[in-house]
Amino acid sequence: MNAKGIALVATLALMVVIALLVFGTFFTTQIELWTTRNDTTSVQAFYAAEAGLQKYKAALFQQYVWREQRGGTGGGGGCFTSLARGLDLDRDGTITPFVNNRLVLAQNEVVTDANGNPVGRYTATLYKDAQDDQLFTLVSEGTSGGAKARVQATFRISNSDYLEQAIFAGAGQANKWLNGGATIRGGVYVVGNPNDPDQYVIEANGNFALYNRYDLTTYSEVTNRVEPSYRQVQDLCASLRVQYGKISVGGSTQIGEPNNKVKGVFVGRGAQDITGENVGVCRNNKGVCTEAMGGFDLSDPPPFPTLDAKLDSDACSAYPTWRACLQGKAALRIQRIGNILSVASPPNATLSPSCLQAMQSGTLTLDTQSVDCTFTRLDGSRGGFRYTYTGGQELLEVFGDVVLEGIDAVLNRPVDYRAQSGSAKSATLAVLKLGGNGGNLDINGNLLPDATFGLFPNHALGFVAEGDIYQRGQHVMAPVYAGGTFRVVKGNVLFASVISNQFCTTSAGNQMSCNASQKAEVVYIRIPKENRPALLPSLRGGKPSGIPWGGARE
């Protein structure tokens, strides 16, 4: 048999992989003995090789999901997967590392037929790309008698979870969901509207750009707020995914660059949902500079997270809804019902009079008056939040997760923040609706981590607004969730991730419309999983996505 060069379709069936998790780590490989003419041993060698490929392809995805569920995966700012450091196939805590980007998974493993008779052996070897920690090649070499066969598959394995993107968006609005002069450095994921798959969720006819890199030296005002290893990343493993909807690429739009392509563009039903053509780059690929392009590729995609749906995250999986999780996990929870403010939890907390007075109107405005909403917990640690006005660079300290219900929040001045939950330098500040009131956040000045307390992303404060978030401050360094619209004024930059139903650029801070021609930016700085604000949206084990890059057999 000589089938060199024939493509092997490497279909990565994630639903099958998840099912395999229920029945154990590995499964016994068996094949039905198939003979053709007099070339039995050649056929058996090929099927031995194919058995090794399929077994360890499934095992790799099982390993990935298990590692993501365990946490502590680490990783830096660029392309990363928890498999990059090696594998723990026995799940005993001992990782077998790659040696020169090579790891032998099985040596002369026996393959039997349905009757238990040995028909061949295979050796399976995994190769990691030297430049890209998400790209792997699995090679399986089979033997039977004197015959030999070899099959291989190259694939990318990554996580499509909420905070693995620069922007994760919901249904958006009809027409021009993301357009004009916005610059996105990192991946974009749009759920879209299943009832309107012909809607354009991205109609990019201006200077819209989606890049796979960033260099914070071009943002000199914030460079010293970020860990040195995160200040410049040349490969973010960025992809563009649209579950329902179309994109249009025109004008001087850039999606990827010829010398730094995005990893994939996966839109709706495929090529028919990618229309238009931009000027001068990647002309043979509809003006899209990408390593792979096709229809939406996830079999079990993550939904847009909402407060009254269950959130299957590590922190919230035991709660019926994300709202209930926020309420139950909060170190401090304050409610405003009508004109009455109360501390919903913890019971018997003693707060400064300035705390509830600051929210009496229904809006907590952090401006020229200090506000102290801290208290001493039973273990002696501090809980709640405190805003200190100094007349220069103000300070917001958050101790544990804070939930404000029926209240809007406004940060009116440039603010440094300090976030702490136990030993972690992270926390979540949430504003939720109650009785039709509250749930919105305005950020009117710079909002950055206090570098004397810790550098981003190992020091991060997350924000949740059930309604809208409006960024008028030039630089905001925090992951944010807006159940409604995230608005950002032209010339402003958010560093981290945006999860919002709609992303909107505006021409000025008093505008509610989404202006197509305004240049604003989102720069994706990846937060290590172990330091992500625990109550922000996430999914246990992430959402693994496997992109087949091709295969061969011989």
Go through the PLM ranges and name each one.
Residues R156-S160, Q393, V415, A419-S421:
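Short boundary motifs at domain starts and secondary-structure transition points
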Residues N2-A171, G192, Y524, K529-E554:
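Beta-strand/loop motifs with alternating small/hydrophobic and polar/acidic residues, enriched
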Residues G120-A330, L434-N440, N444-N446, F456-P457, ...:
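Short, ordered "entry" segments at domain starts
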Residues P414-A424, L429-V431, G435-P457:
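Sequence/structural signature of small/polar-enriched beta-strand/turn repeats
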Residues G170-N179, G186, G192, A324-L326, ...:
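Extracellular beta-sheet-rich ligand-binding/adhesion modules
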Residues D39, F98-T112, L178-G181, Y200, ...:
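Low-complexity, repetitive regions of proteins mediating host interaction that are extracellular
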Residues Q393, F399, A424-S426, N458, ...:
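A general structural motif
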